[in-house]
UniProtKB/Swiss-Prot annotation:
A molecular function (GO) term: RNA binding
UniProt-listed Pfam families: RRM_1
GO cellular component terms attached to this protein's record: cytoplasm; nucleus; prospore membrane
Source species of the chain: Schizosaccharomyces pombe (strain 972 / ATCC 24843)
Keyword RNA-binding belongs to the record: yes
Domain RRM: from-to ranges: 20-103, 419-499
Annotated localization: Cytoplasm
Disulphide connectivity of cysteines: none
Protein name in the entry: Meiotically up-regulated gene 28 protein
Length: 609
């Protein structure tokens, strides 16, 4: 056989498993590839096109060869339409023969007769050829292991609450179609399985929707490699998706576009985590219960059972008000015999990539977080610190009653917008206008408004401003990242913004309690006692010297002076009297020869005693 012409550049495509090959015989000798291309083009796209020639029997006088062709369509529907329309039709004077490609009978007989010889022979090429022919000639209906999910389908699927409706049928293999027709089901594509919710068929319970998340872990097979196999229940075959982990149930009203990337890109969506959820609660019941208190976008329940025989669930709401209302309504409340614990889920760094690769969920991370989001309106407890005590004095116990903790009452706490931030200590050399301030905070999320305070006349920055985010999580991340950071020559202060009146009220509530008067510490006087005595603290001021001597029994220090000083004192008085008789110019230590000589005998008398 000689190949006349290969596929044109327009229709040249790679071979696919879902391609269907048909045989076109009895073509006229004058037929060109372009004519055959125009004949089969209305029935659909075909990836391969081969026109071949075969010489007739030697007994025939005609020397014109017989032409035939093989055409490979992309789907079975196009091949069926081409066979039904062109088989037996007239084309340039010849009656066409259009049918599915099959192996010639003589090759089948050779195969059947030589099976045993091939199995027992040592010819590796024969075994390989036999395996290829055997694979080609097996039955049309595949086995369970052959029905795979198509990985190259790009069609989208729509979902109804009670059943699944396939809006655009995918292009699948003929064997898969045959299996779908035999079982009354449809083959889903990889994208459909990853995003579409497959219903769980149960008799006693309502139809819940369960999603099998896509796992990209190296140790766990992904959804694209997962088999779809039929399982029989009450003589009815359904598609069952085998998975390496437990599924998570989701409410029927969940939209298909609400994936982790969609949740992250739309900051108006809040996710509430629910702990201690009873096992008997379904997503539909939880959705109906919470929908009375706000607009619910979706509900997801993790089917892995905790140690306390409860489930973990998440609820997606559209507004911050609905989120707070649901938490105030159901937090720490008994629900179906269990105390629910609700919290606002806080995203972590690498939110999108971590959630898309997480093996336990696709809507959000279905594991309870380690820490809760701090409330923006909490006021830290300020404790009064006492000074270090004097090691020589044991203070009385009544002073410890003054050391109290100032805790503001909840009624005096003003409400603070969790999205609005106040920034001060901005360096003018780095942030000089509103645009630069917005660029500084834009990496944390979408900014609704941004203002930098400046002087009207000179437009010089005052060093503080306000930034309003669209989501509280973004504001929390900005505070945790920039507060206290050395920015230029100054250290930034980033916190929640509040009105000046509210700030005064909050500060007055903290410092409203008057502190007791400070008791002055007494001056310590260590007496000259012969025996050590225990000193006790007293509030009286030090007594005069005479009372102190009488109280403690001390003697007058003058009584202990030696008797030999009496004569010295008499000599001193005589010297003073003799000094008064001197001239006025010689008094009071005026340097004079007579004054010097008059003091010399006195000095000698004192030293000689």
């Amino acid at each position: 056989m000689i190949a006349l012409e290969k596929l044109s550049e327009k229709n040249k495509r790679s071979t696919k498993k879902c391609e269907i090959s048909i045989y076109v015989g009895n073509l006229p000798s004058t037929c060109q590839s372009s004519d055959l291309h125009e004949l089969f083009e209305p029935f659909g796209n075909f990836s391969k096109f081969h026109m071949l020639s075969r010489k007739k029997n030697k007994s025939t006088d005609s020397k014109s060869p017989t032409l035939f062709a093989f055409i490979t369509f992309e789907n079975k529907c196009s091949a069926d339409n081409a066979i039904a329309s062109l088989n037996g039709s007239s084309f340039q004077g010849n009656t066409l023969k259009v049918e599915y490609t099959h192996i010639v009978e003589r090759y089948k007989n050779k195969l059947e007769n030589g099976v045993d010889q091939i199995h027992h022979s040592n010819n590796e090429k024969a075994k390989i050829r036999f395996s290829k022919i055997e694979k080609y000639t097996k039955e049309t209906r595949p086995t369970v292991s052959e029905v795979r999910v198509s990985t190259k389908d790009k069609k989208e699927y729509s979902m109804n609450t009670s059943n699944l409706v396939q809006s655009n049928p995918p292009k699948v293999h003929d064997k898969e179609n045959a299996f779908a027709e035999a079982t009354g089901t449809s083959i889903l594509s990889s994208k459909a399985v990853q995003t579409l919710l497959v219903s769980d068929f149960t008799e006693n319970e309502p139809k819940h929707l369960s999603i099998r998340p896509n796992c990209k872990d190296n140790n766990t097979p992904s959804i694209s490699n997962t088999f779809i196999e039929p399982y029989k229940e009450n003589n009815t075959e359904h598609l069952h998706l085998k998975s390496a982990f437990e599924p998570c149930q989701m409410m029927p009203g969940m939209l298909l576009e609400q994936n982790p990337q969609f949740l992250y890109d739309n900051p108006s969506i809040f996710v509430i985590g629910i702990l201690n959820l009873p096992l008997k609660v379904s997503p539909v019941e939880l959705y109906n219960e919470f929908s009375n208190h706000g607009h619910i976008l979706g509900v997801a329940i993790n089917q892995s059972i905790n140690e306390d025989m409860t489930h973990y669930a998440e609820v997606a709401v559209s507004t911050y008000e609905s989120c707070i209302e649901i938490i105030e309504k159901f937090h720490a409340i008994a629900y179906e015999g269990s105390i629910l614990q609700l919290f606002i889920k806080q995203p972590v760094q690498g939110f999108c990539s971590n959630l898309l690769n997480h093996p336990e969920g696709t809507m959000t991370n279905l594991l309870p977080p380690n820490m809760e989001m701090p409330q923006p309106f909490e006021i830290p407890v300020i404790a009064k610190t006492s000074a270090l005590p004097n090691p020589f004095i044991s203070f009385p116990s009544f002073q410890t009653s003054y050391e109290t903790t100032v805790t503001p009452t909840p009624t005096s706490t003003p409400t603070i917008d969790p999205c609005n931030l106040f920034v001060k200590n901005l360096d003018d050399n780095i942030v000089g206008n509103t645009q630069q301030l917005e660029e500084l905070f834009s990496k944390f999320g979408r900014i609704k408004s941004c203002t930098l305070a400046s002087y009207p006349s000179t437009e010089i920055s005052k060093g503080y401003g306000f930034v309003s985010f669209s989501h509280p999580f973004e504001a929390v991340q900005a505070i945790n990242t920039l507060n206290g950071v050395l920015f230029g020559k100054k250290r930034l202060f980033v916190n929640y913004a509040e009105k000046r009146e509210d700030r005064k009220k909050r500060l007055s509530a903290i410092f409203s309690q008057s502190y007791p008067p400070v008791v002055p510490s007494p001056s310590l006087t260590i007496p000259m006692a012969t025996e050590p005595q225990i000193l006790e603290y007293h509030q009286e001021w030090p007594q005069p010297l005479i009372q102190s001597i009488q109280q403690h029994g001390y003697s007058d220090p003058r009584q202990t002076l030696p008797t030999r000083l009496d004569s010295c004192a008499a000599k001193l008085r005589e010297a003073v009297i003799s000094n008064e008789n001197l001239n006025p110019s010689h008094k009071f230590g005026i340097k004079h020869s007579t004054f010097k000589t008059s003091l010399s005998p006195l000095t000698n008398i004192v030293l000689n005693q």
